[in-house]
Amino acid sequence: MSRFNVRQVAVLGAGVMGAQIAAHLVNVKVPVVLFDLPAKEGPKNGIVTKAVEGLKKLTPAPLGVPEDAALIGQANYEEHLEQLRDCDLIIEAIAERMDWKLDLYKKIAPFVNDKAILATNTSGLSITKLSEALPEAIKPRFCGIHFFNPPRYMALVELINTPTTAPDNLDALEAFVTSTLGKGVVRAKDSPNFIANRVGIAGMLATMKEVENYGLTYDVVDDLTGKKLGRASSGTFRTADVV
């Protein structure tokens, strides 16, 4: 394919990951529009507005300049799907429900332009299974792009292809993630939880087994497996609580 020129990115889902991915795109001066469901009360973009405002209060800060939150475009699936036509990269980051993701893909498919890459930020669902909801024309441009929390600070991004992902498209996306977003990319197979989470969960389970063997308390384990092992902020049990 020709050079992947990302003029604008759409992020679908204004939750913890979606909002922070949008923030990091703003940090590196990439225009971005953040989508979510229409609010049931008040302005239709209320869910996204609340998420964008929340970015200013998070620690560690997802925005290099808090005022740059205003640069994140706000949209909802009811009124603004036409905006997807102007996006060269669409990152889906909604809740980890296969059925919800498949429904969303069917809704957005008519608005994905014929050169855009569509990528899911799922942390472990089957990328191939997700691709089954897409038209044949989009499947070569669909893949997994797994950021880690918090995305501004975590260097790793996993890229996952399906049997129908065009290699040139994955190469182009990797170039964007490394050169523009400043991330290190590891390509993973479409296996449960990919690489990092699969290894991480195995480590947690092994640690929990030792807790039983030695009668350790949660606080002691989190102290031993937290900053003493180089983890940024949390040990085994605290991490298990949030993932």
Regions found by a protein language model. Give the residues of each.
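Phosphate-coordination loops involved in phosphoryl transfer and adenosine-cofactor binding
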Residues: 5-8, 69, 87, 115
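Short glycine-/small-residue-rich Rossmann-like dinucleotide-binding loops
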Residues: 94-95, 123
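Rossmann-fold NAD(P)-binding glycine/threonine-rich loop
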Residues: 102-156, 161-174
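Conserved N-terminal Rossmann-fold NAD(P) cofactor-binding segment
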Residues: 31-88, 98-99, 103, 134-136
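Substrate-binding/catalytic subdomain of NAD(P)-dependent oxidoreductase enzymes
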Residues: 160, 186-243
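N-terminal Rossmann-like NAD(P) cofactor-binding module of classical short-chain dehydrogenase/reductase
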Residues: 91
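NAD(P)+-binding Rossmann beta1-loop-alpha1 motif at the extreme N-terminus of oxidoreductases
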Residues: 1-57, 111
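Generic secondary-structure signature for well-ordered alpha-helical cores
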Residues: 53, 57-60, 110-113, 175-183, ...
